Amino acid sequence: MENLSNRSYPPGAGVLTIVHGQKELATMAVALARSIRLRDPDLPLAVVTNFDPALFEGMFDYVIPWDFSRWTYFDAKLDMYAMSPFETTIFLDADILVYRSLADVFICFEGDDFGVVGHNVKDLGWFASMDLIRREFPSDTYCYFNGGIYFFRRSEVAAAIFERAMSIYERYDELKVYRHTSCKAEQRILCLAMVEAGIKARRPGSGRGYLIDAFWPTGCRIEKDVLSGICVQTKLGRMRGERVFLHFVGVLKSSYGYLFESLRLKWAFRYGRRGRDVDFILRIYALFLWRKNIPGFIVERGRTSVKQIKSRIRQMLGRGSD
């Protein structure tokens, strides 16, 4: 278990996430907040959204309304600097669950004004013409990273990166930048702004050696327990590292693993009970949701959703409902 007494954050630090477009992301953002609160109860959290603030009641310190009409979807993150109420910000996608204290992430970016976690490579598949990119943005390497996590401080350097990214964004098609699922992708633009600022990606590890990586660990086995703070990846029977968080991208949002962990978080925060009997019941319910492809816990956060879960569990126990 992690020693929570070692947690430390920069002054004015907080965590930011964005929820728009898909309403199920509201419930995922709440699951994200719960996973953070388990280990960082005093770290301020903010959500920027165009949904009803009541969906986030009690879990976020700031619920910030925002107009997303100019954005296709992912590219709304180019507004992160303007959105954040914090002096030092960790941005996390709503479909992430956190397994360790985020103090490790602050350690990773200590001294930085802006940062991402990934790899510095010579060629990127994000652009139709690397020759064009090299002419416009000459560099030996380019940052390859997943946009599930960003770090930035309120500073001239970070402000300049986001300002430059906005101007590059206007040339998205001219620069022959590929879209992601028909939407413009912010990390492909921020990558180019980082080149001009001379900023490289951090490797997936912090000062204490934990993996900070928003890419899903393909080909690895993951042992995870969000309530106990366990997230270990192994490959061919060998431990490859302990992860600070997992990013349930794409179809992983509706996977059994995500459903089960989210249900456990909801149950623990609402009822404070845990144990093998509860886990067994929640495993059955998560399997039911996954097999039916009806993520019922996503439909609506609040009393209705919890009552549905409670009623379903009672039915499975043969106790009827009340």
Region locations from a protein language model:
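Short, acidic, metal-binding catalytic loop of nucleotide-sugar glycosyltransferases
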Residues: 35-43
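N-proximal low-complexity "stem/linker" segments adjacent to membrane-targeting elements
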Residues: 1-27
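Short, hydrophobic beta-strand segments that form beta-sheet elements in well-ordered domains
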Residues: 42-51
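Active-site-proximal specificity loops/subdomain of glycosyltransferases
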Residues: 50-84
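GT-A fold catalytic core of metal-dependent nucleotide-sugar glycosyltransferases
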Residues: 73-126
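Conserved hydrophobic/aromatic beta-strand scaffold that supports enzyme active sites
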Residues: 80, 149-151, 245
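Conserved catalytic core of nucleotide-sugar-dependent glycosyltransferases
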Residues: 108-168
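A glycosyltransferase accessory/donor-loop signature
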Residues: 2-12, 159-322
